[in-house]
Amino acid sequence: MIPTIAILSGGFSCEREISLMSGKAVKKALDSLSYNAIEIDVDSNIAEKLKKINPGLAFIALHGPYGEDGCIQGLLEILGIKYTHSGVMASAVAINKVMSKHIFRSLNIDTPKGYVISREDVLKNNIKIDYPYVLKPINEGSSIGVYIIFSHEDYLELKNNSSTIMEKMIVEEYIPGIELHTAVLLDEAIGTIEVRPKNKFYDYEAKYTDGFAEHIFPAKIPDNIYKMTLEHALKIHQFLGCKTISRSDFRYNPKNNTLKMLEINTHPGFTELSLVPEIAKLAKGINFNELVKIIIEDSLQHKNIRDLSHVEQYY
């Protein structure tokens, strides 16, 4: 019997519109695969909606806080509903850039130097990192609220738009060079793509507007660096106990031959323009519909919907 699949999208975060796009793409794929799929716009009544539908699986097409930070995952576990993507712990740790950077370092994975800074210190320009630096939220995605400050003029422009500065943010060194993204699928790092944005960096517009960035696969970087992206992405995916898919983001500086890991995303963007589907297609010949089916089948076969972390291997 084919289970009913509830597609959870929308939600409360700044990434709501992206989530709705992901949800519609998944619904289209599931319809073509003849699954019984129901789209649910997540709100404060989500528990009641899920109990009424009683789906066999929840496909999480949510992004940002409440969707990929362990909140919806915890609710689904309480309700006894299987779900796609990673569990509570992996989701909560991965979205928190401070926590995840500590874990990168503990696994000997290099990451940009930085620290947590208050809104007050940003406004006073009490910043201990020289230009250029990056200012970004602790737990948002899709490059929302990310600023690259190359000069004092950039800082003044940011200060004049101070409403976008959060109470706590991360400030870290800017790594010049090449933007890299590595996909993990079913415990295999399947490939790394290079992104050359037309804007200053790979921002929201470049991520979700066709033609705003050039994608190169496989990434044109030295073989040993390419191999390192695959190794690092798989290592952190397994350490956190991520499930089915994830995407790890890196910067490579060819001038000093250094690779820095920026973050791991347990719920990467999931439209046909998104990076993980693109890598799956180019690396493995897996089209979008097939990728959706793989995620569903892998999620349904897990008897235990709780986290399966491999942390004990490193303890």
Swiss-Prot record:
GO cellular component terms, semicolon-separated: cytoplasm
Reported EC number(s) for this entry are 6.3.2.4
* Reaction(s) catalysed (UniProt annotation): 2 D-alanine + ATP = D-alanyl-D-alanine + ADP + phosphate + H(+)
Binding residues for Mg(2+) 2: 263, 265
Q: Where is the ATP-grasp domain?
A: 101-297
Q: Does the keyword Manganese apply?
A: yes
What is the documented function of this protein? Cell wall formation.
- In its UniProt entry, what is this protein called? D-alanine--D-alanine ligase
Q: Which organism is it from?
A: Wolbachia pipientis wMel
Taxonomic lineage is: Bacteria, Pseudomonadati, Pseudomonadota, Alphaproteobacteria, Rickettsiales
Q: Which gene encodes it?
A: ddl
